[in-house]
Amino acid sequence: MRRAKTFFAGISLLITLTFAVAEEPQLGSSRVVFQTNYGDIEFGFFPSVAPKTVEHIFKLVRLGCYNTNHFFRVDKGFVAQVADVVGGRTAPMNAEQRKEAEKTVIGEFSKVKHVRGILSMGRYDDPDSASSSFSMLLGDAPHLDGQYAIFGKVTMGDETLRKLEELPTRKEGIFVMPVERISILSSYYYDIDGDSCEEERSLLKRRLAASYVETERWRMKCFP
């Protein structure tokens, strides 16, 4: 009888684990890299979980809207939050960037859990008010589950997030904010399923373009 109970307990555990794996969303093939002054952070998207959110954020990335933006909030063990690009950037936006940045997306809430590395949209009380600000989870936050739209996760750069967690902070209202600006110097994107040679050439061009944006910004600032 004891062996039978052990057998059925093992089967039950296997079924539970199978369902847990099945519920984990699959990442799409697109990858985005934020180059910060503390290191790179790469992330991917969950198009099957939040398709409209993914489309919106990825378009902002492709337009270069996150370049010269920053992380306005770093709460150790909780979130590192990217500022809204309208008002968060140091560089002015062109008309196309501003048009996309001022859009909001519907709240695509899901059963995906808020755990470390997850990307989750920021918003106001209105569930459909998410725009361009989003958080990278620095720990488990079950109280956010089903309340904020999850659209992707960090795929590389956890060591950079850990650096951010150790930076000096100050408290302003409910927010824990870094004392010094954590800049997103530039950004680029690539596709892990693309043709290797062509994708590498395209990736190199985007990285060079992203670097040029930051170089030009510093040139204008330091050598007027």
Regions found by a protein language model. Name each.
Residues 1-5:
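Positively charged n-region of N-terminal signal peptides that target proteins for export
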